[in-house]
Amino acid sequence: MKLKTLQLQNYRNYESISLNCHPDVNILIGENAQGKTNLLESIYTLALAKSHRTSNDKELIRFDSDYAKIEGDLSYRYGEMPLTMYITKKGKQVKINHLEQSRLTQYIGHLNVVLFAPEDLNIVKGSPQIRRRFIDMELGQISAVYLNDLSQYQRILKQKNNYLKQLQYGQKTDSTMLEVLNQQFAEYALKITLRREHFINELESLAKPIHSGITNERETLSLNYLPSIKLENKDKSETERLEEVLTILNDNMEREKDRGVCLYGPHRDDLGFNVNGMDAQTYGSQGQQRTTALSIKLAEIELMNIEVGEYPILLLDDVLSELDDSRQSHLLSTIQHKVQTFVTTTSVDGIEHEIMKNAKLYRINQGEIIK
C-alpha cells in the first residue's frame, strides 16, 4: 500500500497543507519544533485513529481552531481509496471512501503503518507496557478480530477492577458478580493469549534471520512470550484451556479481593528477548539492544506483508541518527524499492545510501512546506 496524497487542516501547527507523496522515500527536513514529527504523527493517527504521542485528541487541533482534519488517498494492489479523520473537541469521526464508520474496528487496518522512533529503541530495556503496546499495535492492524477481543477484554477488566475496589472497601459483599465477570474475563483472556503466542512465534521466525544478518551471524536472537496466565499443556482443547484459565482466576480470587485489583491476565503479559541465550534486557549491551529493536521492526514489516498481502508504510521519526552506519545501511537496504517510507531528520548529511538518489525531499518550516 502507498499513501499518494496527504491533506491536513488545522492539525497541530499546520493550518492547511497538501502533500503529494513519493511512492518510495519521503524525507522531511527541518530544524527542531518546526512540525516534522507532527506530519509523521498525522499519518500514524490516520492509520490507527489515535496518536502515539498523546491520549488527548484535543491536543491535535490547532490552537485557534475548533476541528482538525486528516485525509489521505491510498493506493493498493486492488485499487484506490480515501481515508478521512475529523477531530473535534467533542470526539472524532472516521470515514472509508467517504462513508462514516460507526466502529473503529471496522476502520483500523485499511492503512497499516510501522513507526520507528528513538523511544522504540527502548522496546528491549523499557517497561512491559511498551512491549504490550507494540504487540497490540501490530496485531490490531492485521486482525480486526483481535482488536475487537482486546476492546472487550479491556472493558471487562475495567468492570472487574471497579468491582474488586468496591469489595475491598466493603461497598459490595456479593461475589457472584465477580464469578460472572471472571467467566467473561477468562474467555477473552484466552483468545488474546493464544493470538499473542502465535504472533510472537511468527515474529521470531522472521526476526531471527534478520538479526543474524545484521550481526554477520555472530548473534542469535530468540523471543520469549511471557503470559501472565501460563497454560501448561498446549495439547489441550480450547474448552479445557478455558477451564484452566478459570481455575487460575478462581484460585487467586481472594488475593485479588485483598489487593482490590486484577492480578492476572493479558494486561500483565510481557515479552522477553534473548541474544545468544542471554537476557538482552539485563545483560545485553546498548548495541545488542538496538540491533534487537531494529530486527523486530524489520520483522514487523515483513509479517504485516505476509498477513495482509501489502507492505505497510514505514515512519522513521529521527531514528536514523540514532543508528550507526552499519545498522542504518541494513535498514535502508531492506526497505529499498519495497516499503514506502517517511523520514524526519534535521539534515541528510551522514545518510550515505543509494536510496537517497530517488528520495523526495520536503523542507518543513513553522508548519509549512517550503518548495
Swiss-Prot record:
Disulfide bonds: none annotated. It is found in: Cytoplasm. GO terms for molecular function: ATP binding; single-stranded DNA binding. HAMAP family: RecF. One of its GO terms (cellular component) is cytoplasm. It comes from Staphylococcus saprophyticus subsp. saprophyticus (strain ATCC 15305 / DSM 20229 / NCIMB 8711 / NCTC 7292 / S-41). Pfam families: SMC_N. Keywords: ATP-binding, Cytoplasm, DNA damage, DNA repair, DNA replication, DNA-binding, Nucleotide-binding, SOS response. The keyword DNA repair applies. ATP binds at residues 30-37. The keyword Coiled coil does not apply. Coiled coil: none annotated. This is DNA replication and repair protein RecF. The RecF protein is involved in DNA metabolism; it is required for DNA replication and normal SOS inducibility. RecF binds preferentially to single-stranded, linear DNA. It also seems to bind ATP. It comes from the Bacteria. The gene is recF. The lineage of its organism: Bacteria, Bacillati, Bacillota, Bacilli, Bacillales. Its main location: cytoplasm. GO terms for biological process: DNA replication; DNA synthesis involved in DNA repair; double-strand break repair; SOS response. Belongs to the RecF family.
